[in-house]
Each structure stands twice: as C-alpha cells, then as structure tokens.
Amino acid sequence: LGWSACTVDPVADPNNPSTSGITQNATIGELQNLVVGAEAGMRNSLNNYYDGVSVIGREYYRFATSDPRLTGDLLGKGSAMLDNNTFYTTNPFNARYRVVKNANTLITALQNTKAAITDGQRKAGIAYAKTVKAHELLMVFNQQYENGIRIDVDDPDKLGPFLSKDESLNAIQNLLNEAYLDLKGNDVEFPFATTLYSKKALEFLKFNRALAARVAVFRKDWALALTALNESFLDLNGSLTDGVYYLFSTQGGDLLNPIFFPQDTP
C-alpha cells in the first residue's frame, strides 16, 4: 500500500514578516510597497511634532484642556521642564526613525533587485530613498538640536553613535549631496510611483535641493544655501502653492490631517 499527499508550500508568517525576501530580490510591486509605506509613515505623529516645535518656537498657542503639558511643559510654565520620555518627544522620534528604516530597506532592495529596471532608475531610486531619509533625520534633529542624533541606524543590533549637532547636520547634508549627484543629469523616472513632487528624477532633484538649502542655512553655509535654492522649485515670481506636500484623505484606512482643526472647534 502507498500513501500520497499534497505538498505544503512554505508561507511567510504574516505576523512576523522578514525583510530578507524584499532586500534580496524585490519585485517592482514590493519596491512600490516600500515607497508607499515610507510616504504613509512620514505623516505619523506630525501633530506631536508641530505642537512641540511650534509652541516652543512661539509660532502658535495650543489650546487643549485635555493635556496641560502642551502649555505647561512646552512653554516652561513655572518650574516645568521638557520631558525626555513623553508623547511630544518619543512619538515623533519613533515615527521618523520608522521611515528611516523603510528608506534603508528600500536602498538595500534597489541595490539587490533583479527586476527589470535600468541602472539610471536604480540610482534615482536610491537617491529618492536618501532624500526621504535626510528629510526625516532633519525633523529628528529639529527636536534634538544640541543633543545631536543617530545617523547610522541601518543595523538595529549595532546602532551608530549619537553625533554632535554639527556632525549631525554635516551627515544630513552629505546624504542629500550623495542623492543629488545621482539625480543630476539622470533623465529617468523612478521605478515606482511617488506622491512627493515628481516621479521624474530631474524634477525630484528640486525637492532635494530645497532640503539642502535648509540644512545649509542651519550650517551657516550661505553660499551653498543660495546655490541649492537656485536649483530648487523656489521661484520668486511663481505660485505660492508650488512645493512638496503630505497627502491626507477621508478614505477608509487613510489618515486625516492631524494639524487641521475646523474653525471655532472647541
């Protein structure tokens, strides 16, 4: 007598997914998923971030009877001090580094993929990831400032050191400049869709240079700031709506704009 049975194909655990499959030979669809995840994640905890930097910067006053820390801690009421382990610090910190993780995964995936993309598209895609990564690290820096930030976080089991303020800015500028070199003169489209300004590498370069100009100002490198601005989307005679945006919607499963409040809302 003999017995036969169906073969069982191995299935990845959906509750504990691994990045190894994506980083070793990602499909175009998987590359797109990484981009969607990064751009969706860029919107997380923006309310905490902008409440923090805006209230401390005296750009607005946050009326919220549910949490006195928004005026107490952030405005230094009485003897109040900023808390290094509360929502206005840890939430945006974690959210930004999650996107950095996505960007690092995308870079590795693009380096190793055997999908039908050109070398120019591969370079442009990596430049996109580096630009997004620099944007997120700059937001972390804006809240940490003199504390400095970690730049090297590619290996979660062996994190790089916290850099000084100047070292952090220099590292972010270098990241943007590396991306710029791979975008400049690269007349291709990314091998994925993006909501960030343009899918064309030469157009996306303008976003990269806008960020580079901002970092250059922080570094007091006025010459680089002016040069970068001239290569960005800035146009003194252009439309005030030209630029790069976060996208929100009321569709199921998507996010509403967390810093929009209807007029006269209590």
Where are these regions (language model features)?
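Membrane-proximal, proline-rich intrinsically disordered regions
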Residues: 6-57
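Conserved, well-structured interaction surfaces
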Residues: 32, 70-144, 159-164, 176-177, ...
